[in-house]
């Protein structure tokens, strides 16, 4: 990949912002737009074209994350609406991989992903019971939950049915989302510990790194002539 200094600078600013937020230094959120410019620029210089779906995703995620840090309860509808739009928009990118995957044979390969998904669903179910009565709005919560579960499902199933090495990044993407969303709710409604916040912010940082890395390699995955599908 080219221009890796953009990625390194993004990681550096992301780490600085995480520590500043942990010390309750509020101006740290102004670093987030800079981080978005850096990670999107890293994508563009590598693929040599714009990706407006990715730009839309990064913009929605920026709004989601900034207003989560300002006041999640107050801006609950805005945060979850942007989260849902961002997550559903990214299904556009992986859909070509989904269409080419063979789901008709080898269900034994799907056992581990399904068991993992069941474990995640159990954790989410328990978490919903704990926070549900405190949610400011129920109607926006369930579309956001659907978006999260859909994304985790595809991130778990695709690498099991398409063995291309670069698809392994989807496990990290799905895992980052599986950490990010619950920790946002835990921090706001159950346990306002800086440790929980660090987990949430770190997962936000890692999610974008693995996502952009995967999208840079997506054409190579789709055009690969080896029998991975």
Regions found by a protein language model. Give the residues of each.
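Polytopic alpha-helical membrane-helix bundles and their juxtamembrane interface segments
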Residues: 1-229
């Amino acid at each position: 990949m080219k221009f890796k200094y953009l990625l390194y600078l993004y990681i550096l600013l992301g780490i600085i912002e995480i520590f500043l937020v942990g010390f309750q230094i509020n101006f740290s959120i102004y670093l987030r737009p800079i981080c978005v410019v850096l990670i999107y620029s890293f994508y563009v210089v590598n693929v040599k074209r714009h990706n407006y779906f990715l730009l839309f995703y990064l913009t929605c995620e920026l709004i989601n994350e900034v207003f989560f840090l300002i006041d999640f309860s107050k801006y609950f509808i805005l945060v979850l609406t942007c989260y849902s739009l961002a997550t559903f928009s990214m299904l556009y990118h992986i859909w070509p991989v989904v269409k080419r995957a063979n789901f008709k044979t080898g269900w034994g390969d799907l056992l581990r992903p399904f068991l993992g998904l069941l474990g995640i669903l159990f954790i989410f179910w328990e978490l919903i019971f704990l926070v549900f009565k405190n949610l400011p709005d129920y109607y926006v919560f369930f579309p956001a939950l659907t978006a999260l579960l859909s994304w985790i499902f595809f991130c778990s199933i695709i690498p099991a049915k398409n063995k291309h090495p670069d698809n392994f990044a989807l496990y990290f993407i799905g895992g980052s989302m599986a950490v990010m969303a619950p920790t946002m709710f835990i921090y706001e409604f159950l346990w306002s510990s800086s440790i929980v916040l660090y987990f949430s912010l770190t997962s936000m940082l890692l999610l974008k790194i693995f996502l952009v890395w995967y999208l840079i390699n997506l054409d190579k995955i789709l055009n690969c002539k080896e029998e991975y599908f």
